[in-house]
Amino acid sequence: MSPVRALVLTGYGLNCDYETDYALKLAGAESHRVHINELISGQGSNPDVDLSTFHILVFGGGFAWADDHGAGVVLASKIKFNIGEQIERFIRDGKLVIGICNGFQSLVNLGLLPGFRGDYQERSVALTYNDSGNFIDTWVNLKINPETPCLFTKGISHIELPVRHGEGKFYASTEDIESLFESNQVVAQYANEDGNPASGQWPENPNGSLEDIAGICDPTGRIFGLMPHPEGFNHFTNHPNWTEKKRILEKERKSIKNHEGDGIRIFRNAVEYISERYKV
């Protein structure tokens, strides 16, 4: 069987590529870290940098171009100008795209999200400065929409993940937010400990996102963007309460070494979808 191939973008301030690459490999993918310039210059020449040979494209977290002109703006411009047509072809071929934190900001600036009516050019939503005016680094509870078409969150109802950003507030017009909810494109909302949406309350909603929106997808469910970091929860010891989890595992005589974090479920869903679709 051929492997499920994932491409993780690197370069110019993207700094979560190693853990994202690791998470994809844990999920069963053949993952490659590829510099943006290599991808742009290497089309068709080397299978390790030829986008058409991959099934999953990852815009990871970090601070691309130091967030100059706004988070994800320069990265989106460079991608759109140089390989925008290849990205659109990648999407038309039924492949998967995920944007995490800075990657989500880039997808929004590219117009790939929300992709209303199949339009992957128009920018219609934004991720802007946190209400606090400060960079945040904490963990959040997420409520996952059970009706969403998002392929990455299949079988997940709630999940805890870390967030670390300065421009994570989801903002859009009332009309566009209503459209997102009507089409079930709102994938994840910040939630309280009871699993209910945070209703804008801090710290459960850490940035002031309208309607507690933490992640959205396009109408097909194959393009997903979220501010929290699933790759940041690749092992149970990543969690701030890991010592309590360790005590429970030891009591149940379960393996500690191989007990992965819940964030891997998002990547595994992607790998399993591609495996089934392409029979790889």
Feature roles, as predicted:
Residues 136-138, 183:
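A short, compositionally biased
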Residues 1-100, 104-122, 128-136, 197, ...:
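N-terminal beta1-alpha1 cap of cysteine-dependent amidohydrolase-like domains
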